[in-house]
Amino acid sequence: MKYRIALAVSLFALSAGSYATTLCQEKEQNILKEISYAEKHQNQNRIDGLNKALSEVRANCSDSQLRADHQKKIAKQKDEVAERQQDLAEAKQKGDADKIAKRERKLAEAQEELKKLEARDY
């Protein structure tokens, strides 16, 4: 019975997925999608964890807090990019080609992650 109720709730959430009006509702719907997927694959540990996350979102989520957290992530990633740029500059000073290539790769990864974060409209 629990399974049928959870499935019905999940399917309802999936059908209403395009109607999210707030960030918290969007987050809740994403968790419900994950629950549906976990139920499909009979992953009870994942279902339990997602149900706990869903309870937390329903109890504590606020759009302003999500925006603030997102801005913190962006600031942290900008610091990461700056650190990677510094590491690359130091590697170039030393002239070690292997380290330069490694630092360039890490810088590119950090910059890509920053772009993804900035593209998310919170």
From Swiss-Prot:
InterPro entries: DUF1090 (IPR009468). Residues 1-20 form the signal peptide. Residues 66-100 have a biased composition (Basic and acidic residues). The gene is yqjC. This is Protein YqjC. It comes from Escherichia coli (strain K12). Pfam families: DUF1090 (PF06476). Residues 65-100 are annotated as: Disordered. Keywords: Signal.
